[in-house]
C-alpha cells in the first residue's frame, strides 16, 4: 500500500521514534553511467513552508542532528559497500521538512545504471546495505 509523503511524516512524528530514515534508489535515465550513494538531510527554504511540522521544521538542533545522522550513515555506507561517495546533501524533500525528529533520506544507488542495478537486486548486497545503515545509526547514537 502506498503511503503518501505527509502521512509518512505524520506516522514518524507520532511513533515516538528517535530518528527517521527514508530509503530510496535513484535513477538518471539520461545518463546510465551515474552510480553511487548519497544521503540527504533537510535544508530550510522559505519557499517551502511546513504543512504539519510548523514547530520543528526550521529548528537548528534538529537540522544539526539530521546532518550528523546523514554523515554517520553515508560514511558507513561508502566504507562498507565500496560505492561511489556522492556525498551528504541538503534538500527540502517533504519527508525531511515535515518530520519533527532527525531525518535523512538515503539514495542507495542508481537503478538506471545496469551495473548498479545488478548489485542492488542481489540479496547479499541488500544485506550489506542494511548492515551499513545499521552501523551508521549505531555510530550516530554513540
Region annotations inferred by a language model:
Residues 1-142:
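Active-site-proximal helix/loop segments of hydrolytic enzymes
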Amino acid at each position: 500500500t502506498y503511503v503518501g509523503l505527509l502521512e509518512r511524516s505524520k506516522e514518524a512524528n507520532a511513533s515516538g521514534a528517535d530518528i527517521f530514515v527514508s530509503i530510496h534508489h535513484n535513477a538518471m535515465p539520461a545518463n546510465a553511467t551515474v552510480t553511487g550513494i548519497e544521503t540527504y538531510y533537510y535544508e530550510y527554504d522559505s519557499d517551502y513552508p511546513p504543512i504539519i511540522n510548523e514547530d520543528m521544521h526550521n529548528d537548528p538542533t534538529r537540522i544539526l542532528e539530521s546532518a550528523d545522522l546523514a554523515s554517520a550513515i553515508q560514511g558507513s555506507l561508502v566504507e562498507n559497500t565500496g560505492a561511489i561517495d556522492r556525498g551528504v546533501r541538503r534538500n527540502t524533500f517533504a519527508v525531511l521538512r515535515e518530520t519533527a525528529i532527525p531525518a535523512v533520506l538515503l539514495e542507495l544507488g542508481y537503478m538506471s545504471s545496469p551495473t548498479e542495478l545488478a548489485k542492488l537486486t542481489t540479496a547479499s548486497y541488500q544485506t550489506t546495505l542494511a548492515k551499513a545503515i545499521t552501523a551508521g545509526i549505531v555510530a550516530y547514537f554513540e
